[in-house]
Structure formats: C-alpha cells, structure tokens
C-alpha cells in the first residue's frame, strides 16, 4: 500500500511539473507573439507616416520601387508561403524568426530612436532564444554554421531625409520582415498549444 502511494505521489508530482512547464512555455510564446505584433504595428505606422509626408509625385515614384527591391533578409532561408510555413517544424520557425530579428540589430538604429526599436528587437531576440533552447532540449541547433546576412551597409552610408528611395526600402523591408516573424511565431505558438487547428 505504501509503495502504491509513493508511485501515485511521483505520478501526480510529474503531472504538475509537466503542466507547469507547458503553462510557462505558452506564456513565453504569448509574450513573443505580443512583442512582434507590436513591432509589426509600429512598422506599419512608420510606413504610413513616411508615405503621408511625401508629395504626390514622390509617392507615385516610390510605389514602383519596392516590388522590385531586394531586402537584406531575402538571403535568409525562410519558409515561403502558407503551405511551406505550415509544413515547417516549430524549431525551424523559431530559428528563422531569430535570424530575421538578428538581421535588424544594426539597421534598426536608422529607424528612429523615440520608439526604442533596437531595444524591442533585442528583447524579442532574447525571448526567441529561450524558446529555441526549450525546443532543443539537448539537441544540436540547426544551421549552426549559417552566416548572418550582410548588414544594410548602403543604407548606413546614404540614409538621410533627402534619400527617399533608401528610406522607403528600409521601412518597407522592416515591415515585411516583422510580418514574416509574426506569422512564424503565431504558427509555432499554435503548434505548441493544445489547439489542433493551426491553419493560416
């Protein structure tokens, strides 16, 4: 009888521990999604404010640029489209999100200090890093030898109020990448929850 009670105690304790770990994991995912949603909204607002300040002729000229423009982060391997995102593992989505955020560490300094974007990105990167460690659980990280995409060096040298084209590209790419990360983290969060429907 005593042995049965001991076994039951161990089982109950392990269940509580497992449930606690699940709740903590969900809390971390929720926090990461909220943070990237805020950054995406911030990027959209900055883009809107930038476009509103343009003259009609400037707006018309710039609207033709971005669809043909290359973003620095395009060199980062990432799921393309809904189907590929759905098929990607949680670890792959987290790793891709981490690299996208990391690629903005230096360029974000050109996006304006009032909103503390660099600090927000650093916090999000740290949170995603914790989630990756939780998913790895002793495994080796994937793509360890991936080299980070080169920074937006041309933007650093020429970005100014007078250089509308590069300002527009930088803001457009930032908004595009924050949308990607928001999508990847939302799918990863859903996969780690009890929700069986994680369609986009």
Curated annotation (Swiss-Prot):
<keyword id="KW-0732">Signal</keyword>
<feature type="binding site">
    <location>
        <position position="38"/>
    </location>
    <ligand>
        <name>Zn(2+)</name>
    </ligand>
</feature>
<dbReference type="InterPro" id="IPR034975">
    <property type="entry name" value="Somatotropin"/>
</dbReference>
<comment type="similarity">
    <text>Belongs to the somatotropin/prolactin family.</text>
</comment>
<dbReference type="Pfam" id="PF00103">
    <property type="entry name" value="Hormone_1"/>
</dbReference>
<dbReference type="GO" id="GO:0043434">
    <property type="term" value="P:response to peptide hormone"/>
</dbReference>
<keyword id="KW-0862">Zinc</keyword>
<comment type="function">
    <text>Growth hormone plays an important role in growth control and is involved in the regulation of several anabolic processes. Implicated as an osmoregulatory substance important for seawater adaptation.</text>
</comment>
<protein>
    <recommendedName>
        <fullName>Somatotropin</fullName>
    </recommendedName>
</protein>
<keyword id="KW-0372">Hormone</keyword>
<dbReference type="GO" id="GO:0060396">
    <property type="term" value="P:growth hormone receptor signaling pathway"/>
</dbReference>
<feature type="disulfide bond">
    <location>
        <begin position="190"/>
        <end position="198"/>
    </location>
</feature>
<dbReference type="GO" id="GO:1903576">
    <property type="term" value="P:response to L-arginine"/>
</dbReference>
<feature type="signal peptide">
    <location>
        <begin position="1"/>
        <end position="22"/>
    </location>
</feature>
<dbReference type="GO" id="GO:0042594">
    <property type="term" value="P:response to starvation"/>
</dbReference>
<dbReference type="GO" id="GO:0046872">
    <property type="term" value="F:metal ion binding"/>
</dbReference>
<keyword id="KW-1015">Disulfide bond</keyword>
<dbReference type="GO" id="GO:0042538">
    <property type="term" value="P:hyperosmotic salinity response"/>
</dbReference>
<dbReference type="GO" id="GO:0045927">
    <property type="term" value="P:positive regulation of growth"/>
</dbReference>
<dbReference type="GO" id="GO:0005131">
    <property type="term" value="F:growth hormone receptor binding"/>
</dbReference>
<dbReference type="GO" id="GO:0048513">
    <property type="term" value="P:animal organ development"/>
</dbReference>
<feature type="disulfide bond">
    <location>
        <begin position="71"/>
        <end position="173"/>
    </location>
</feature>
<dbReference type="InterPro" id="IPR009079">
    <property type="entry name" value="4_helix_cytokine-like_core"/>
</dbReference>
<dbReference type="GO" id="GO:0070186">
    <property type="term" value="F:growth hormone activity"/>
</dbReference>
<dbReference type="GO" id="GO:0005615">
    <property type="term" value="C:extracellular space"/>
</dbReference>
<dbReference type="InterPro" id="IPR018116">
    <property type="entry name" value="Somatotropin_CS"/>
</dbReference>
<dbReference type="InterPro" id="IPR001400">
    <property type="entry name" value="Somatotropin/Prolactin"/>
</dbReference>
<dbReference type="GO" id="GO:0046427">
    <property type="term" value="P:positive regulation of receptor signaling pathway via JAK-STAT"/>
</dbReference>
<feature type="binding site">
    <location>
        <position position="182"/>
    </location>
    <ligand>
        <name>Zn(2+)</name>
    </ligand>
</feature>
<keyword id="KW-0964">Secreted</keyword>
<keyword id="KW-0479">Metal-binding</keyword>
């Amino acid at each position: 009888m005593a042995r049965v009670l001991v076994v039951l105690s161990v089982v109950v304790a392990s269940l509580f521990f497992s449930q606690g770990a699940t709740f903590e994991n969900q809390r971390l995912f929720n926090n990461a999604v909220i943070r990237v949603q805020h950054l995406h909204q911030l990027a959209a607002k900055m883009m809107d404010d930038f476009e509103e300040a343009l003259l009609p002729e400037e707006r018309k000229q710039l609207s033709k640029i971005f669809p043909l423009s290359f973003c620095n982060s395009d060199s980062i391997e990432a799921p393309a489209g809904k189907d590929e995102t759905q098929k990607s593992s949680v670890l792959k989505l987290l790793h891709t999100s981490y690299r996208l955020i990391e690629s903005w560490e230096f360029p974000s300094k050109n996006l304006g200090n009032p909103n503390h974007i660099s600090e927000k990105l650093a916090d999000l990167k740290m949170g995603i890093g914790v989630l990756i460690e939780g998913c790895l659980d002793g495994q080796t990280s994937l793509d360890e030898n991936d080299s980070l995409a080169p920074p937006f060096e041309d933007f650093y040298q020429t970005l100014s109020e007078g250089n509308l084209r590069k300002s527009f590209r930088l803001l457009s790419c930032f908004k595009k990448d924050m949308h990607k990360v928001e999508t990847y983290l939302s799918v990863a969060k859903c996969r780690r929850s009890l929700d069986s429907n994680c369609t986009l």
